[in-house]
A protein has these predicted regions:
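Transmembrane beta-barrel strands of outer-membrane/channel proteins
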Residues: 32-40, 81-85, 121-129, 166, ...
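Gram-negative (and chloroplast) outer-membrane scaffold detector with strong preference
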Residues: 67-145, 156-160, 211-212, 217-224
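Predominantly the C-terminal beta-signal and adjacent terminal strand-loop region
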Residues: 171-245
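Outer-membrane beta-barrel proteins
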Residues: 41-47, 88-94, 130-136, 187-191, ...
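Short glycine/proline- and aromatic-enriched beta-strand/turn motifs that initiate or cap beta-hairpins
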Residues: 22-71, 217-245
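Membrane-spanning beta-strand positions in outer-membrane beta-barrel proteins
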Residues: 31, 76-78, 116-118, 165, ...
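Flexible, surface-exposed loop regions and adjacent strand-edge segments
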Residues: 48-53, 95-99, 136-144, 193-201
């Protein structure tokens, strides 16, 4: 899929729209956002030798989240909360953890509200309300050999993440949101022992379930206003895009 035209259009929208009255305290009170958030768990031990085609292949997602954000008047701070569904996969999904989380956090926007680009720093907490424990044994046969894997998963009840992000306002009240956080699990761990049919040695894997999380989504601020400047900026961007194309 060629994403270059979409990227060009987004950049044109950001550069063309007037921002003088984009985000003053009268026009931005609260917001909702919807995101997709793939994650990459940290693995602290992997004893599997290179001779086996068995890379860890950790990952997860795209996970889904939805939040409500309240902007504290006359400050650059906000409070945010919502729901995050997160799946962490190990061994391409042979071992996984499914988390349903209540998210609570805060953000600091340190640039002028008149800027179309709004970077922020913050802290997020994730409270897991789903089941925590899972254990079992699975086996697999394939072109790279047969193996048996015993695993144990203890999902964290709480994760804490420093975050850095950027809101890119395409219109007065609509922004593209990009966010990175390192989610540190409290009392979480995943472990496994893998034994190959041709090798009786058990190979261990361990993860504290800390993970990198990159989120991309759409934010809408309220009261919602679609201004004449937004219409003009959209038309100018489309005409410029068509001309460049």
């Amino acid at each position: 899929m060629n994403t270059r035209p979409l990227i060009v259009l987004v950049l044109l929208l950001c550069l063309s729209r007037p921002v003088a009255n984009a985000q003053d305290d009268d026009s931005r009170r609260w917001a909702i956002d919807f995101r997709l958030s793939p994650v990459k768990p940290v693995v602290t031990l992997n004893e599997t030798p290179d001779k086996y085609y068995d890379p860890i292949k950790t990952g997860g997602g795209p996970n889904f989240s939805a939040h409500i954000e309240y902007f504290i008047p006359q400050t650059g701070f906000s409070v945010v909360g919502g729901y995050d569904h997160e799946v962490m996969d190990f061994y391409s999904g042979d071992v996984s953890a499914d988390l349903s989380q209540i998210m609570l956090g805060g953000r600091w926007y340190f640039l002028s509200k008149s800027c179309a680009l709004q970077p922020y720093l913050g802290v997020s907490t994730f409270w897991n309300v789903a089941g925590r424990k899972d254990a079992g044994t699975m086996s697999m046969s394939g072109m790279y050999g047969s193996y048996e894997r015993k695993y144990s998963v203890s999902s964290p009840v709480l994760s804490v993440a420093p975050v850095v992000g950027l809101d890119i306002y395409l219109f007065s009240c609509v922004a593209l949101e990009v966010d990175y956080g390192f989610r540190m699990a409290v009392d979480g761990h995943t472990s496994s022992q893998t034994t190959y049919r041709k090798d009786a040695t058990p190979y261990a894997m361990r993860s504290p379930m800390h993970r990198h999380a990159l989120s991309v989504g759409l934010k809408v601020t309220f009261p919602f206003k679609f201004t004449n400047s937004d219409v003009t900026g959209l038309l100018d961007s489309l005409l410029t895009y068509l001309y460049l194309k």
